[in-house]
């Protein structure tokens, strides 16, 4: 029997702050791969139980076949063996070793398990136009962005008026809001039903009859 309650975070919040405040990364902090680490059940379980009490969490639970679970477990082990758990942010493409935030890391399990189509997870994606002049760090060498400029900028780039860089990511707040909204509206399907744990809303997806994908877990490198 295997069990894991894992997530990825930045290895040091102080380091991230330093990159923005002292190194002038600006919005480039969302594009750069920075040191990360994986948190396990001993850290995540108390937080999850507390959030279930307060309702500050939403969830989607999948009932899997043993075959699919074994594939996901293999993915988790190999992800750590490759050292990808130490890469945070970046391109948010964990299967390509490009780094990942917590949300992209979670969704990657749905991709590996062939489960992504069972729930409208693409509704959680956010696309923004980051003004190029507010991007520093490796993506804009030699360009230092003052934190003050970030503080007073309250909008994304106007694509018709200024250069920009596209940033795409799974937004945790959107994930929470979408799941809770669907629950309250009574969203359901043949294999999907709403459920509640404490004061937390979510869904149960019964998909134990779905076979594991036959394609390799890791995409071929080009």
Regions picked out by a protein language model, each given a short descriptive name:
Residues 27, 38, 65, 69, ...:
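Solvent-exposed, acidic/flexible segments
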Residues 1-2, 25-27, 55-60, 163, ...:
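Generic structural motif recognizing short loop/turn segments at the entrances and edges of beta-strands
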Residues 43-47, 67-75, 174:
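Exposed alpha-helical structural elements
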Residues 1-50, 221-222:
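Glycine-rich catalytic cores of cysteine/serine-nucleophile enzymes that process amide/ester linkages
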Residues 49-67:
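Active-site-adjacent helix/loop patches that line small-molecule binding or acyl-intermediate pockets
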Residues 37, 64, 68, 164-171:
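Non-membrane alpha-helical secondary structure
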Residues 61-85:
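A structural motif
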Residues 78-222:
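Activation targets extended, charge/polar-rich intrinsically disordered C-terminal tails
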